[in-house]
Swiss-Prot record:
Protein's gene: murB
Protein name per its UniProtKB record: UDP-N-acetylenolpyruvoylglucosamine reductase
Compartmental location: Cytoplasm
Reaction(s) this enzyme catalyzes, per UniProt: UDP-N-acetyl-alpha-D-muramate + NADP(+) = UDP-N-acetyl-3-O-(1-carboxyvinyl)-alpha-D-glucosamine + NADPH + H(+)
Function: Cell wall formation.
Source species of the chain: Phenylobacterium zucineum (strain HLK1)
Residue ranges occupied by any FAD-binding PCMH-type domain in the UniProt entry: 27-216
Chief place where the protein resides: cytoplasm
Principal EC category: oxidoreductase
Length: 300
């Protein structure tokens, strides 16, 4: 008997040996040992408390910034659903958003409530949970600029309230989330009052800019590499000659050369292999290290 045969009782759903490709924007990747779809926060907390400590736990949002390797993922993959996607104004320029709420929905609801400052989320793929993990942002704004506090569970199911400072944010990183496995439940944000029409106009500009410059309708995971200090990743990839080059079924987009795309039949190995080839070439030609922004998980 293995740990999979003695999983804790839950009110949500447990899926065994389920392919993860349909759960990611790249549409690649092997199966998870177990996928857990919790009914609510209490269901999730109880499950984590009862799950043997040696079982790995991975949280997967909408899979926008994640590359699941072809061998699949050990342990339990947690996928948060509608119960974790609530978005509601809290008064005084504040807004609560669940970890499963899409970033673009958070931007929209903030705008409708006359809360400015969260417009940048219109241009960020994925969910608030992922944004909290990596201090997601774009166009000169990022999560730490608007976060008041975040709510999370530890691997042991303990509830935490974490201030902005507690999370130790820097460029595309939370020191706290990097040091300790956290399952984010939601967060409280604070903006400033503004006219909803003016906010919507700014978000429309962001949408137009994205559609013109990014391959948002392709099978992609968003920005592939972080920008190194003093450099733009897209420019380094472009100048190294990788824009539009095929590697198996993988390619760096002709529209934006920091966007890795699945042209249709790519494997996770194709996508990661192309990324690593580009990293090596950029290092050799320019002496600059490109660090992955896309999270790569699982067995090769």
């Amino acid at each position: 008997m293995t740990w999979k045969d003695r999983l804790p009782a839950v009110r949500g759903k447990l899926l065994r040996d389920e392919p993860l490709a349909p759960f990611t924007w790249f549409r690649v990747g092997g199966p998870a040992d177990v996928i857990f779809l919790p009914e609510d926060e209490d269901d999730l907390a109880a499950f984590l408390k009862a799950l043997p400590a040696e079982v790995p736990v991975t949280v997967l949002g909408v899979g926008s910034n994640t590359l699941v390797r072809d061998g699949g993922v050990d342990g339990v993959v947690i996928r948060l659903g509608k119960a974790f996607a609530k978005v509601e104004p809290r008064g005084e320029g504040r807004l609560y958003a669940g970890a499963a709420a899409l970033d673009a929905v958070v931007a929209r609801e903030a705008g409708k409530a006359g809360i400015a400052g969260l417009e940048f989320y219109r241009g960020v793929p994925g969910t608030i949970g992922g944004a909290l993990v990596m201090n997601a942002g774009c166009y000169g704004a990022e999560t730490k600029d608007v976060l008041v506090e975040a709510y999370a569970l530890t691997r042991a199911g303990e509830r935490l309230t974490l201030s902005n400072a507690d999370l130790g944010y820097s460029y595309r990183k939370s020191a706290r989330a990097a040091a300790e496995p956290l399952i984010f439940l939601g967060a409280l944000f604070e903006g400033r009052p503004d006219d909803p029409a003016a906010i919507e106009a700014r978000m429309a500009e962001i949408t137009e800019r994205r559609e013109k410059t990014q391959p948002i309708r392709e099978k992609t995971g968003g920005s592939t590499f972080k920008n190194p200090p003093g450099h733009s990743s897209w420019k380094l990839v472009d100048e190294a000659g990788w824009r539009g080059k095929l590697f198996g079924g993988a390619m760096f987009s002709p529209l934006h050369s920091n966007f890795l795309i699945n042209t249709g039949e790519a494997t996770a190995a194709d996508l990661e292999g192309l990324g690593e080839a580009v990293r090596a070439d950029v290092k050799a030609k320019f002496g600059v290290d490109l660090d992955w922004e896309i999270k790569r998980i699982g067995r090769p």
